[in-house]
């Protein structure tokens, strides 16, 4: 039963109604390695989970040509927009994976592949009965430990205070991650501002930035 469900999810994950040279294809039998992500091997690799319209990664890719950027996004309209932007800027260091990362993550990539992973504004699922649907949980932290090397960085942002506090508690309990300077930041300069983030700021919402370094595998 579990195996049948997993096969069905893989089938859904690989069912993209259009093609592009910027797509990566996930496989249930072979993990993606740095050698088969791009036409060349980059110095470092950056993974954005839920890349939306792609503006954050594209802005960073323009500034960091020696880093390969992998974007995981499941919504087709956002993927199409991102592809147009990649083509507009003639970027050779951005690829897209149309896979729901809440289904498959460490199953897709080889260990220690990414030096940085970004998760911006995931659904906070505010109702208590929906908390189990939240992306960041103890299992997710184990996935981060697999994908990041020691000293690898994880960037997280939310505009929902209770979610931020829960994430902080999870990291405290993990012991594998350490804040770079402080547990919670009100500003972040390393990552460009997304459309969603700008909108929330204009609405007067407080943004919670939680960045961590993997210190123990």
From Swiss-Prot:
Q: Which residues form a coiled coil?
A: none
An MF annotation (GO) of this entry: tRNA (guanine(46)-N7)-methyltransferase activity
Q: What is its EC number?
A: 2.1.1.33
Q: Which reaction does it catalyse?
A: guanosine(46) in tRNA + S-adenosyl-L-methionine = N(7)-methylguanosine(46) in tRNA + S-adenosyl-L-homocysteine
Pathways per UniProt: tRNA modification; N(7)-methylguanine-tRNA biosynthesis
Query: What GO cellular component term, any one, is given?
Result: tRNA methyltransferase complex
- Annotated residues for binding of S-adenosyl-L-methionine: 48, 73, 100, 123
User: What top-level class of enzyme does the UniProt entry assign?
Assistant: transferase
Task: Say which family it is in.
Answer: Belongs to the class I-like SAM-binding methyltransferase superfamily. TrmB family.
Q: What is this protein called?
A: tRNA (guanine-N(7)-)-methyltransferase
Give the species this sequence originates from.
Leptospira interrogans serogroup Icterohaemorrhagiae serovar Lai (strain 56601)
């Amino acid at each position: 039963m579990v195996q049948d469900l997993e096969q069905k999810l893989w089938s859904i994950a690989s069912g993209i109604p259009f093609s592009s040279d910027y797509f990566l294809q996930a496989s249930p039998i072979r993990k993606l390695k740095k050698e088969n992500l791009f036409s060349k091997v980059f110095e470092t690799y950056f993974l954005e989970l839920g890349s939306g319209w792609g503006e954050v990664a594209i802005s960073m890719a323009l500034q960091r040509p020696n880093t390969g950027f992998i974007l995981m996004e499941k919504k087709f309209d956002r993927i199409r927009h991102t592809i147009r932007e990649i083509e507009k800027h003639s970027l050779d260091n951005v690829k897209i994976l149309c896979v729901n990362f809440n289904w498959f993550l460490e199953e897709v990539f080889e260990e220690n592949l990414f030096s940085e992973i970004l998760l911006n504004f995931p659904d906070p699922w505010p109702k208590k009965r929906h908390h189990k649907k939240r992306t960041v949980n103890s299992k997710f932290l184990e996935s981060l430990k697999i994908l990041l090397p020691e000293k690898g960085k994880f960037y997280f942002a939310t505009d929902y205070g209770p979610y931020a506090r829960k994430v902080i508690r999870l990291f405290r309990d993990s012991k594998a991650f350490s804040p770079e300077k402080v547990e919670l930041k009100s500003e972040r300069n390393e990552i460009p501002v997304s459309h969603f983030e700008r909108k929330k700021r204009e609405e007067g919402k407080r943004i919670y930035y939680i960045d961590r370094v993997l210190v123990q595998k």
